[in-house]
Amino acid sequence: MNSYQEMVEPKETIESETNFHNLSDKWTLWAHLPHDTDWSINSYKNIYTFNHVENAIALCETIPEIMIKNCMLFLMKGSIKPTWEDPQNKSGGSFSFKILNKNVFEIWKQLFYSLVGNTITNDKEYLKYINGITISPKKNFCIIKIWMSNCKHQNPDKINIDIIKGLGIQGCLFRKHLS
């Protein structure tokens, strides 16, 4: 495969999006190679932008498990870039969860769907401050993060752990993006 896009773009083209179901936000999937030491925005690859339920499902179901376990992926809301320096991220932080490799694929998919479907939390005020999710591979586990636009909302109890099986708040850490 020559590009990230070839790995994840839905295989079938749907003729018309007129009957599609709108999401409340537009989302972009970004990728970054874990061993790339360039952290400028140029090193991130914009994979796919979508704002319909059907496109979200097609994308999520197309991403190979090996890519989820071995590539840094960023699912970001609207025009938010996957960097701490983005104006909508710089005053924020993220919740970090350590996930064993055997659980990563399923947890990523559950988080993906709960994020774009606005069910990641029941608190609508809290939901407004969630900018995206990321995954970073390590040797035997991955770190999954939920990015927040500010540091006022540091309570992981607000995240719907019940619908994301395997994601626990025990051991969850919140870290500011920039000091």
Protein language model regions, located:
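Conserved NAD+-utilizing ADP-ribose enzyme module
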Residues: 1-16, 24-26, 42, 63-179
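Short aromatic-glycine-(Arg/Gly/Cys) micro-motifs in beta-strand/loop hairpins
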Residues: 20-42
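Non-heme Fe(II)/2-oxoglutarate
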Residues: 40, 53-56, 87
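A short, exposed loop/beta-hairpin motif centered on an aromatic-Gly-Thr core
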Residues: 44-49
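A generic structural signal for alpha-helix starts
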Residues: 51-54, 103
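Short active-site loop/helix that positions an aromatic residue
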Residues: 54-65
